[in-house]
Amino acid sequence: MNLTLKESLVTRSRVFSPWTAFYFLQSLLINLGLGYPFSLLYTAAFTAILLLLWRTLPRVQKVLVGVSSLVAACYFPFAQAYGAPNFNTLLALHSTNMEESTEILTIFPWYSYLVGLFIFALGVIAIRRKKENEKARWNTFDSLCLVFSVATFFVAPVQNLAWGGVFKLKDTGYPVFRFAKDVIVNNNEVIEEQERMAKLSGMKDTWTVTAVKPKYQTYVVVIGESARRDALGAFGGHWDNTPFASSVNGLIFADYIAASGSTQKSLGLTLNRVVDGKPQFQDNFVTLANRAGFQTWWFSNQGQIGEYDTAIASIAKRADEVYFLKEGNFEADKNTKDEALLDMTAQVLAQEHSQPQLIVLHLMGSHPQACDRTQGKYETFVQSKETSCYLYTMTQTDDLLRKLYDQLRNSGSSFSLVYFSDHGLAFKERGKDVQYLAHDDKYQQNFQVPFMVISSDDKAHRVIKARRSANDFLGFFSQWTGIKAKEINIKYPFISEKKAGPIYITNFQLQKVDYNHLGTDIFDPKP
């Protein structure tokens, strides 16, 4: 048979081989399983790599396929909720223990695990493929695969260079290589941030207090968790689930924007002094109150991993008195209720104090899974049980605020209380009976959170519509408590209708993004 014709037939048989289709499907699922958007280019290029390796280095191909399939299978449920690895996901990995990890695993829909098993099964099939007895000659198809896969490797680096960036081979868009790079780079950034945090947390604060004129005897900061503003009736939600906040005399901020989309990053930027985008962990609102002569208390229902290893722990340990409902690791006992914190505040308020008091309560609030917070209870069904429980967590927090307010009124001391949430959440599996909410950074609702101030001398229920940013929280804290410090630049009166200027948030890639450029994730009230 003519050699050219024979080579043409071999090429055609390989192009239309079931294994070519198999590797294409596997490449596609690995791409999606690692959290990256579908790309026909990289799916086809990775298929070409697998075909080439099978021809030349079959054992290497099996290792690559096996490892990639295993990682993609395990990561697939997370990828659908959180996307590709970034600073936030690696930070969460560092600051989450087995208990919370187990809880997170139960929130993903069952079919995410089914797809993960399917990806793993494809990997097993690929590994078990028998080697061909006769090694075929190198042909045109092999050359095309080689040229195509190598050329694709340079696409992203060349694009970066063309768009004013730097040409780096490590920026290749191949999902497998990109995943490894994203994990390594972001993990190094997290470790560097934690080392810097530990160093600064052990240092003395650098506040220069210039005046201390508190209006009230007791100040209370209640830090909520994962509450998006449109889930609370008092802040424009469709449900009458916050009767206390909706009616109490005080200030409702209708447009308060969180600093970031996760607890550690958001509160790190909110509660600490920030210089060039980096939190100065030694200079936070607790050390400022200490420096001003306040007595400080920190009561938490979020547990404590260690003394310095999270932004919250580094702040909490600076208070004069610190108590955690959960002994030991974060969420060591997920059944502890936020309401138990009121036993601690009752003890503090029952005592007489000569100094001004700052009491901080850190809630579990609406942290996923919401049904674990409510023991499966909800009042109004909306789309899914988890969504319905999420709405009910707002009622639980509202009831806690009511009881805390009553404690403060009965104490006989003048007081002011501020409540806000660290960040919001976004809907996943929208419109399905498994709909749930998880961390995200793409939508305005991830940053739209409640913020309210209730004081003992308030005479009316008022709403402030001017937009406010959590990046200016220390400015608010200074004005609220009457503590002036040289390091705090007051840009505008926080409790006013004066405009605050453009507002930026910090996304999970640690980039500053204009809040107005974010998408929307509407809370559909349909049952």
Swiss-Prot record:
<dbReference type="GO" id="GO:0009244">
    <property type="term" value="P:lipopolysaccharide core region biosynthetic process"/>
</dbReference>
<keyword id="KW-0472">Membrane</keyword>
<dbReference type="GO" id="GO:0005886">
    <property type="term" value="C:plasma membrane"/>
</dbReference>
<dbReference type="InterPro" id="IPR040423">
    <property type="entry name" value="PEA_transferase"/>
</dbReference>
<keyword id="KW-0997">Cell inner membrane</keyword>
<dbReference type="InterPro" id="IPR000917">
    <property type="entry name" value="Sulfatase_N"/>
</dbReference>
<keyword id="KW-0812">Transmembrane</keyword>
<feature type="transmembrane region" description="Helical">
    <location>
        <begin position="147"/>
        <end position="167"/>
    </location>
</feature>
<dbReference type="GO" id="GO:1900727">
    <property type="term" value="P:osmoregulated periplasmic glucan biosynthetic process"/>
</dbReference>
<dbReference type="InterPro" id="IPR017850">
    <property type="entry name" value="Alkaline_phosphatase_core_sf"/>
</dbReference>
<feature type="topological domain" description="Periplasmic">
    <location>
        <begin position="84"/>
        <end position="106"/>
    </location>
</feature>
<keyword id="KW-1133">Transmembrane helix</keyword>
<dbReference type="GO" id="GO:0016776">
    <property type="term" value="F:phosphotransferase activity, phosphate group as acceptor"/>
</dbReference>
<keyword id="KW-1003">Cell membrane</keyword>
<feature type="topological domain" description="Cytoplasmic">
    <location>
        <begin position="55"/>
        <end position="62"/>
    </location>
</feature>
<comment type="function">
    <text>Catalyzes the addition of a phosphoethanolamine moiety to the osmoregulated periplasmic glucan (OPG) backbone.</text>
</comment>
<comment type="similarity">
    <text>Belongs to the phosphoethanolamine transferase family.</text>
</comment>
<feature type="transmembrane region" description="Helical">
    <location>
        <begin position="63"/>
        <end position="83"/>
    </location>
</feature>
<feature type="transmembrane region" description="Helical">
    <location>
        <begin position="34"/>
        <end position="54"/>
    </location>
</feature>
<feature type="topological domain" description="Cytoplasmic">
    <location>
        <begin position="128"/>
        <end position="146"/>
    </location>
</feature>
<feature type="transmembrane region" description="Helical">
    <location>
        <begin position="107"/>
        <end position="127"/>
    </location>
</feature>
<keyword id="KW-0808">Transferase</keyword>
<protein>
    <recommendedName>
        <fullName>Phosphoethanolamine transferase OpgE</fullName>
        <ecNumber>2.7.-.-</ecNumber>
    </recommendedName>
</protein>
<feature type="topological domain" description="Periplasmic">
    <location>
        <begin position="168"/>
        <end position="527"/>
    </location>
</feature>
<comment type="pathway">
    <text>Glycan metabolism; osmoregulated periplasmic glucan (OPG) biosynthesis.</text>
</comment>
<feature type="topological domain" description="Periplasmic">
    <location>
        <begin position="1"/>
        <end position="33"/>
    </location>
</feature>
<dbReference type="Pfam" id="PF00884">
    <property type="entry name" value="Sulfatase"/>
</dbReference>
